[in-house]
Amino acid sequence: MRITQNVKLLLFFFFFISFLFIAVSAGESKCECSHEDDEANKAGAKKYKIAAIPSVLAAGVIGVMFPLLGKFFPSLKPETTFFFVTKAFAAGVILATGFMHVLPEGYEKLTSPCLKGEAWEFPFTGFIAMVAAILTLSVDSFATSYFHKAHFKTSKRIGDGEEQDAGGGGGGGDELGLHVHAHGHTHGIVGVESGESQVQLHRTRVVAQVLEVGIIVHSVVIGISLGASQSPDTAKALFAALMFHQCFEGLGLGGCIAQGNFNCMSITIMSIFFSVTTPVGIAVGMAISSSYDDSSPTALIVQGVLNAASAGILIYMSLVDFLAADFMHPKMQSNTRLQIMAHISLLVGAGVMSLLAKWA
């Protein structure tokens, strides 16, 4: 049942965003601020876009599946040194994606001269990113609280049942009663520890699902941007940058999925959704390229809002759920060498993704 609900939610987000862009493409455009050169070679751009679909798909699959290979290779399992270093790299990638790729895009769209009126003088991009980050915190907090309370109630029922069983022994003597009570108390401690572990597991799963939603929103937008582009130079640059972009983002999401200890079906569904989102976005962009005008006010608002919200989600997730959680982990805190390696990996990941901002 939970898997079905997750699939429906992801499908809803994906198709809602896709249909939103199709609806935008059907609208009239009266702004001539940023049309591409009329002499752009559409045929030249098309070959790059067609090649990008399988290439970006393969890059996404490689990226998201690499951390999931921990089931077969012990060195890739969560809480190993290699996993911490790899996850720090992925966190740097996601942080740079939010700050260097998505947020500037949002600012560019929502501050375009094509948007007339005093209302657009308000810094909507930063405001929307802030609200998205707060909402992500709320989802994180309330979901964790819900699972914590659910496991506390379950542990309490088990403890009450054991006490009733112990009381029903009656004439077994004080020694036997003491033994049963001690035994029940031990089970209570184990139950509490198990409950805390389950709460943390559920929180990790919530983090993975929220992160995937943020990535999907951004991936659809950037995929449609490539698909709708009419310039061969733009398409070529986006093609190359998107391959690395998709691979690195997949690395971060795959690490989060691996820690969530999902079942095989959930892993498959989440991996497929991540991998196909950008290629399908490219296909949608190609389909609407003849009528889509990314300089129309409606298109600018839609892209700006989605980019700003996605940036808020990605920045929050990278700082709070990736970096803060891992860098404060007891294993990291007790190992100076691991801390240095993780910091270097973080800087490399953020640096590489920041460099890619020149092209995508």
Curated annotation (Swiss-Prot):
Keywords noted in UniProt: Cell membrane, Ion transport, Membrane, Signal, Transmembrane, Transmembrane helix, Transport, Zinc, Zinc transport
Major localization class: membrane
Residues in compartment: Cytoplasmic: 71-81, 140-205, 258-267, 321-339
GO CC term, one of those recorded: plasma membrane
Molecular function terms from GO: zinc ion transmembrane transporter activity
Source species: Arabidopsis thaliana
All ranges on the Extracellular side of the membrane: 27-49, 103-118, 227-236, 289-299
Signal peptide limits: 1-26
PANTHER family listed in its UniProt record: ZINC TRANSPORTER 5 (PTHR11040:SF35), ZINC/IRON TRANSPORTER (PTHR11040)
Name this polypeptide is given: Zinc transporter 5
Similarity-based family: Belongs to the ZIP transporter (TC 2.A.5) family.
Ranges that cross the membrane: 50-70, 82-102, 119-139, 206-226, 237-257, 268-288, 300-320, 340-360
Expression induction or repression: In shoots and roots by zinc starvation.
Keyword Zinc: yes
